[in-house]
C-alpha cells in the first residue's frame, strides 16, 4: 500500500473503554484517512502493563495495513515524544452521584502533568484532543501547561453532544440523519451546554420551521441532550464509551480530513473569537476548516434571548471551573 504520509499519534487511557473502541477505528483509517500510516503509542498508568500488552496483541491480530508501528507504554515522555497528535482520553471517571467539582480536583493533576510533558516532548504543531471530563477545563489545564504548543491546536470534544442533537432532530423530523446540518453546541460539555437549535437546518430549511413546536425544542430536546451523559450512567452504570469513541473519531476527522463547508462544534481557545466570549477559556464554538488547514470560528451567527441567556449560564460555569482549578 502506498501511503501519502505517516503520523505519530499518542492515545492516553489506553486500557479504558473509550480508548478500546477508539484505537481500532484509528488504526483502520477512520481518523486520518485510508492513505495515512499510523505510528501509534498507547499509554496508561504503571501497573497496567499486562492489560496494555493484551491490547497490543489485539491490534497486532487485526493486521491493519495502516498501522506502521505500535508500542504500549507507561511513560508519558515515551508516548508523547515527537508526536503529531494526541488523544487525551485517560481521566478519573465520573460515577453515579459524582459532582463535577470532584472531577475537577481529581483530574487537575493528571492534565497538568500531561500538558507539561506535551510541552517538552510533542512537535510544536501537534494537535491535541481532550476527552476526559470535565473536558473544557481539562483541556484548558493542558493548554496552559504547554506554552510552546499552538493554543489553537487544543480541542475539547463536543462532537458527542453534536451527534446527540443531530439524532434527536432527525428522529423528530422523521428525516435521515444527513438531512440535519449546521448542528451547533456552544459553551461547556456539561449539563449547561447550549444545543443551539436556532442555527440548525433540516433538509436545507431552518429547524425551527420544520419543527415548529418551540416547547419541545426548549424543554424536551435541549435538557435531554444536556443530561444525556448522566442518563447513560444511570442506565448502564458506566459513562458513554462506544458513542464517545465514535464521536472522537469524527471530531478529529473533521479537522484532518475535512469536508468542504462542513460545520462542526468543538471546544477551542476563545482568544480573538467573534462573539465577545472572554479570552483564555476553552469554549464550544461552531467551526469549519479553511483551505490553509486551519479552522475558523463561524462568524455572524445571531442569538435570540433564550439562547443568549443559556450561553451566559454556560460561560459562567466555565469561568468558575477555571477559577477553581487555578486555586488547586
UniProtKB/Swiss-Prot annotation:
One of its GO terms (biological process) is tricarboxylic acid cycle. Substrate binds at residues 94, 100, 133, 164. It catalyses: (S)-malate + NAD(+) = oxaloacetate + NADH + H(+). One of its GO terms (molecular function) is L-malate dehydrogenase (NAD+) activity. The active site is at residue 189. Pfam families: Ldh_1_C (PF02866), Ldh_1_N (PF00056). NAD(+) binds at residues 13-19, 107, 114, 131-133. It is an enzyme of class 1 (oxidoreductase). The keyword Transit peptide does not apply. Its EC number is 1.1.1.37. Keywords: NAD, Oxidoreductase, Tricarboxylic acid cycle. Catalyzes the reversible oxidation of malate to oxaloacetate. PANTHER family: MALATE DEHYDROGENASE. This is Malate dehydrogenase. It comes from Chlamydia felis (strain Fe/C-56). The gene is mdh.
Amino acid at each position: 500500500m502506498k501511503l501519502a504520509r505517516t503520523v505519530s499519534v499518542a492515545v492516553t487511557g489506553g486500557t479504558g473503554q473509550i480508548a478500546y473502541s477508539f484505537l481500532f477505528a484509528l488504526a483502520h483509517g477512520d481518523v486520518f484517512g485510508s492513505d495515512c500510516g499510523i505510528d501509534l503509542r498507547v499509554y496508561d498508568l504503571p501497573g497496567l502493563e499486562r492489560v496494555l500488552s493484551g491490547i497490543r496483541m489485539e491490534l497486532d491480530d487485526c493486521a491493519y495495513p495502516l498501522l506502521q508501528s505500535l508500542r504500549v507504554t507507561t511513560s508519558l515522555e515515551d508516548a508523547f515524544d515527537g508526536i503529531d497528535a494526541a488523544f487525551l482520553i485517560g481521566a478519573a471517571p465520573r460515577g453515579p452521584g459524582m459532582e463535577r467539582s470532584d472531577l475537577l480536583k481529581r483530574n487537575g493533576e493528571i492534565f497538568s502533568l500531561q500538558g507539561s510533558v506535551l510541552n517538552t516532548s510533542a512537535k510544536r504543531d501537534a494537535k491535541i484532543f481532550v476527552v476526559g471530563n470535565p473536558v473544557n477545563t481539562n483541556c484548558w489545564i493542558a493548554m496552559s501547561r504547554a506554552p510552546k504548543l499552538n493554543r489553537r491546536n487544543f480541542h475539547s470534544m463536543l462532537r458527542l453532544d453534536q451527534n446527540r442533537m443531530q439524532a434527536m432532530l432527525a428522529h423528530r423530523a422523521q428525516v435521515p440523519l444527513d438531512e440535519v446540518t449546521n448542528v451547533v453546541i456552544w459553551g461547556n460539555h456539561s449539563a449547561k451546554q447550549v444545543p443551539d437549535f436556532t442555527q440548525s437546518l433540516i433538509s436545507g430549511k431552518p429547524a425551527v420551521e420544520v419543527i415548529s413546536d418551540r416547547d419541545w425544542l426548549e424543554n424536551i430536546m435541549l435538557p435531554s441532550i444536556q443530561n444525556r451523559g448522566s442518563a447513560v450512567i444511570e442506565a448502564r452504570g458506566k459513562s458513554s464509551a462506544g458513542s464517545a469513541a465514535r464521536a472522537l473519531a469524527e471530531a478529529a476527522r473533521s479537522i484532518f480530513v475535512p469536508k468542504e463547508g462542513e460545520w462542526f462544534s468543538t471546544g477551542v481557545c476563545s482568544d480573538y473569537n467573534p462573539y465577545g466570549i472572554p479570552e483564555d477559556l476553552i469554549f464550544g464554538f461552531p467551526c469549519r476548516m479553511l483551505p490553509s488547514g486551519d479552522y475558523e470560528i463561524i462568524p455572524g451567527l445571531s442569538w435570540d434571548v433564550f439562547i443568549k441567556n443559556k450561553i451566559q449560564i454556560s460561560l459562567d460555569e466555565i469561568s468558575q471551573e477555571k477559577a477553581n482549578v487555578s486555586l488547586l
